[in-house]
Amino acid sequence: MSYEERANAHPNLNDESDVEEEALVNDYREQVNFDDGMSELDRTTSLGAASQTQDLQAQLAAAATPLEYQATLETKFASYDNYCSLFHYILNSDGPVELEVPSYYWAWDVIDEFIYQFESFCRYRNRVARSGSNEEEAQLLRENPNTWGCYSVLNVLYSLIQRSQINEQLAAMKRGEDPLAFAGEYGSRPLYKMLGYFSIIGLLRVHCLLGDFSLALKTLDDIEMNKKAMFARVMAAHFTTYYYVGFSYMMMRRYGDAIRMFSHILVYVSRTKNFQKGGNSYDAIAKKNDQMYALIAICVALHPTRLDDTIHSALREKYGEQLNRLQHGGPEALPLFEELFRSACPKFISPTPPDFDNPSVNIDPVDHHTAIFMDEVKNTLYNPTIRSYLKLYTTMDLKKLAGFLEVEPEKLRSWLLVNKQRSRQVRWVEGGLLEGEPVNANDLDYALEKDLIHVSETKAGRRLVDWYLRNLARVY
């Protein structure tokens, strides 16, 4: 079955509301227009004359400033010490720190840069240990195993969340109650509230980098994935959240949910592209945008479904021939799956320091997770070919199909069982991101009775009325 035929047979029941998309676009336009007349200096001045406040302000500004790409190891150590001092002061002072935050952008920048430096340091340390070429740096890293340690970073993020009572505040908002009643002494301060909130997004990112995808999604239990969420006000945070949620779904084989997440943010980005140009995060967003198109190509190949017209056109433009190869399956598609996955996956990290004395035992975390993903792809490699034969019959002998495919009958039986199991996916409906209902992801179903295959096919017609309404709303 061609991509277009499958697309017509699988209407997307989870299309985002165009009204909500328009509201997000308008909100982002207002943010950009407002920020155009406000320099970074304007945002961070007039915060008080007290020297202590000014010192803290300077530390926060430094914490939000990206580290130089070619920074030395000593500079990375010093940056870690500065973050420790800053967060220790914020979390362990006698009472809440009195400081008015300039905007929610600032809190995101601090958490984002903190995690980025942690991630880049872990990858750098792993490269030094695996290469074994720079003994001086290896010795320095060996003597400081806790610098940028996984436990320290997670401890900071969880402490900021706990101190701000942000999860309790978000849960109260979902129940329609006053969040200030649950904020406490610290959570009522914007400084703690903003840092706590974006620490939740930071935890999503860190757990995903560590390969714990279910825990990554669990951290967002109290955050609603809609335009009212605070992260949607910051473009980089908005993009980051949907990227890591979508990727976590993909690694959990919930391809339908992954496609829904990727599609939402890609449509939003396509409609705000003109407002992003010239922004500090434009290049990073453009790169992540390309990565998500690669991931959505993988998901659509493994789980054919109907896409938004904008996404469909862009996907065909970027990966036309490659997408056809992915969908046809077979051994020749394996290198392409791996190439796209490596180019689009997060830069995974290890939770523990490497073994500097035995470089050969250190494994690249990206290689590790790529191997896990490719094992899953290999399990479904012949599904398109098998489906193309089964669609021609209502009953078919197992040995006959094995002859067509030139494989042993028992090997074919295992393929059919794997395909049957993979066709049952959990799809999110409401509640937490980990929740969902089991659904049959394919329009083709079958049952094995000894060596006889019983085939049934269901086709859902396109919802033309909905299609016309969506496109009329865009035109008018």
UniProtKB/Swiss-Prot annotation:
Component of the eukaryotic translation initiation factor 3 (eIF-3) complex. This is Eukaryotic translation initiation factor 3 subunit L. Pfam families: Paf67. Its main location: cytoplasm. It is found in: Cytoplasm. The keyword Secreted does not apply. Keywords: Cytoplasm, Initiation factor, Protein biosynthesis. Belongs to the eIF-3 subunit L family. Component of the eukaryotic translation initiation factor 3 (eIF-3) complex, which is involved in protein synthesis of a specialized repertoire of mRNAs and, together with other initiation factors, stimulates binding of mRNA and methionyl-tRNAi to the 40S ribosome. The eIF-3 complex specifically targets and initiates translation of a subset of mRNAs involved in cell proliferation. HAMAP family: eIF3l (MF_03011). Residues 257-452 form the PCI domain. Coiled coil: none annotated. One of its GO terms (biological process) is formation of cytoplasmic translation initiation complex. One of its GO terms (cellular component) is eukaryotic 48S preinitiation complex. PANTHER family: EUKARYOTIC TRANSLATION INITIATION FACTOR 3, EUKARYOTIC TRANSLATION INITIATION FACTOR 3 SUBUNIT L. InterPro entries: eIF3l (IPR019382), PCI_dom (IPR000717). It comes from Aspergillus terreus (strain NIH 2624 / FGSC A1156). GO terms for molecular function: translation initiation factor activity.
